[in-house]
C-alpha cells in the first residue's frame, strides 16, 4: 500500500463480539473508505445485518462502503484483520485455545491468500502470538506484513492502571507490557515514565504508593481478561479500539511506535517466533522493532515468555497438516 492511496480498504474476518466492536470503532473514528465483513456461511446474515446497522451511522461520521464480504473481496484489500476464532471461556487460558484456533486460522489464511491478497495481515484472535506465527507460516508473506495485536491492549491497561493510581492522564503515562499476550507477559518497569520522568523518580513525591501496590497493580493488568470474562463473558471494547489504532497507523503510514506481536531475529536472544514488543508500524507493515534495553530481570522474563510460546508452537507443528500447509 502506498502512503498516498486515497481509497483504503479493510476486510474483517470474524463478526463476533470483537469483530463487530472493531467495525464500530472504524466507523466511529472515520477510518478507511471501505469495510468488508466476512463470516462463516451460517452467520452470513449477521454480517449483512451488522453492515446495514453500521451504515446508518455514516451520516454522523464519514462516507464508507460497508458490506458483508466473501473471500474474493480480499484481492484488492490493504488490510485483512482476523478476529475469528473459538472464544476464550471462563477458566481457559489463551494458550488452551491453540488446537481449535490453529485449524480455523489455517482455513482463513489459505482462502485470503488464494484471493490474490497482497496487503497486510493484522491478527487479533487468541492466542495471538501463536496465531500471528501461523498466519505467517500459512501465508508465505514477508514477516513485516504479518502483525499481531500483541501487547497493545495489555500496555493500554497498564497505562490506565498507573494513571488511576497516580491521578494523571493515561495519555501522559508511557509504559509497556512485553512478552506473550497472556500469563507470561511482564511489565517493563525500568522504562515506565510519566511525561518523561522515570516512574521511580516520579514516585518519590508519592510516599503513599508502596512497591506491593505496584506488584498488585501489574497482576490486575495481567489478569484483567479473566476478570472481565468472569463478569461479562468476553472482552471486546478495549481490543477493538486497540485494533482501530493499529489500523490507522498502517493506513495513514504513521510510523507509529506500538507494542505489537513482532517477528524475532535475535533481539532479546529470541528467534523465529512472534512476541510482544514495541515496533514502528506504517503503510508497509513493520518498519522495524524498537528494542528497549531490558534489565536482567526483565530479560529473563522475556526469555521465559518466549520459551513458553516456542514450546506451544513446537508441539502444534508436530501436526502434519500444519507442516504441509507451511510456506515460510
From Swiss-Prot:
The active site is at 181 (proton acceptor). Allosterically activated by fructose 1,6-bisphosphate (FBP). Substrate binds at residues 88, 94, 126-129, 154-157, 235. Pathway: Fermentation; pyruvate fermentation to lactate; (S)-lactate from pyruvate: step 1/1. It is an enzyme of class 1 (oxidoreductase). One of its GO terms (cellular component) is cytoplasm. The modification Phosphotyrosine is found at residue 226. Its EC number is 1.1.1.27. GO terms for molecular function: L-lactate dehydrogenase activity. Beta-D-fructose 1,6-bisphosphate binds at residues 159, 174. Keywords: Allosteric enzyme, Cytoplasm, NAD, Oxidoreductase, Phosphoprotein. It is found in: Cytoplasm. Belongs to the LDH/MDH superfamily. LDH family. Catalyzes the conversion of lactate to pyruvate. Homotetramer. This is L-lactate dehydrogenase. It comes from Streptococcus thermophilus (strain CNRZ 1066). The gene is ldh.
